[in-house]
C-alpha cells in the first residue's frame, strides 16, 4: 500500500485507488476481533459503564480526525446508539473554542485538554484518549492529569506501542497502515463500546 493509503494507481485510473482502499479498510475491520480483541473492548466498556452507573462521566479528547471521533462518540452516549434510554454524561473536550483558545494562549497547546480534565474530571470518571500515534503531547498530559485525579483512562491507538499505553488502564490498538484506516477502526470500536454500555446499563448490571 502506498504512503497515502490508497495503493498505486493502475493505468492512471482514479477508480483503482478506491478498489485498493476498500479491501484494506475491510481488512482492518476484520482484524479488530483479534487486536485489540473482544475482551479488551469489553474491559474498556465496563469502565465506562461503571462510571456512568455511579453518576460519573466520560470525557473524550483527540486532535484532528481524532477530535472528530471524540465528538462522534460523546454524541452517541448523550444521544443514543441503539436503545431508547436516558442520556449519559459524556463530554468531548474538543468543542469549546473559547476554552481551547484561552488555554492555548495562556498555557500553550499542550495544556488544552489537561486543563479541562483538571476542571471537569472527578475520581471515578473515565477519559477516552484518542491518538493514532499515542504521542500527542496534549493527549498525554490529559491522560496524566486524569490518572492523578483518580480517573480511569481508555486509549484508542494505532498499531505501535507508545507513551500513551503507559497511562492507560486499557489500551486498544488498531492495526492500520495509515491514520485514516486506524480512525475507521476507532469508530468501529467506539460503536461496539457504546452499544455494550447501553445494553449493560439497560439491564441494570
Model-inferred region functions:
Residues 66-71, 135-142, 164:
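Short glycine/serine/threonine-rich phosphate/pyrophosphate-binding segments
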Residues 127, 153, 170-173:
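Short, well-ordered beta-strand core segments
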Residues 156-168:
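Short, glycine/polar-rich helix-capping loops at beta-to-alpha or helix-loop-helix junctions
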Residues 94, 131, 157, 172-180:
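Short beta->alpha connector loops at strand-helix junctions that form conserved
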Residues 33-54:
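A short, well-structured juxtamembrane/interface segment
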Residues 23, 47-121:
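Glycine-rich, small/polar surface segments that engage phosphate groups of diverse ligands
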Residues 2-35:
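Generic N-terminal amphipathic, Lys/Arg-enriched alpha-helix
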Residues 119, 181-205:
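A charged, well-structured terminal subsegment
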Amino acid at each position: 500500500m502506498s504512503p497515502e493509503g490508497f495503493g498505486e494507481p493502475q493505468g492512471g485510473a482514479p477508480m483503482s485507488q478506491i478498489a485498493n482502499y476498500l479491501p484494506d479498510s475491510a481488512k482492518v475491520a476484520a482484524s479488530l476481533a483479534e487486536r485489540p480483541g473482544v475482551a479488551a473492548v469489553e474491559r474498556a466498556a465496563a469502565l465506562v459503564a461503571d462510571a456512568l452507573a455511579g453518576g460519573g462521566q466520560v470525557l473524550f479528547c483527540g486532535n484532528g480526525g481524532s477530535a472528530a471521533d471524540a465528538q462522534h462518540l460523546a454524541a452517541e452516549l448523550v444521544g443514543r446508539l441503539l436503545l431508547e434510554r436516558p442520556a449519559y454524561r459524556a463530554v468531548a473536550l474538543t468543542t469549546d473554542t473559547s476554552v481551547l483558545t484561552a488555554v492555548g494562549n495562556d498555557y500553550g497547546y499542550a495544556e488544552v485538554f489537561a486543563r479541562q480534565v483538571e476542571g471537569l474530571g472527578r475520581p471515578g470518571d473515565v477519559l477516552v484518549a484518542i491518538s493514532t500515534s499515542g504521542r500527542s503531547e496534549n493527549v498525554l498530559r490529559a491522560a496524566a492529569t486524569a490518572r492523578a485525579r483518580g480517573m480511569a483512562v481508555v486509549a484508542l491507538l494505532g498499531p505501535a506501542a507508545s507513551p500513551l499505553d503507559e497511562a492507560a488502564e486499557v489500551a486498544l490498538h488498531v492495526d492500520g497502515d495509515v491514520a485514516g484506516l486506524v480512525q475507521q477502526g476507532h469508530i468501529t470500536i467506539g460503536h461496539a463500546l457504546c452499544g455494550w454500555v447501553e445494553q449493560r446499563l439497560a439491564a441494570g448490571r
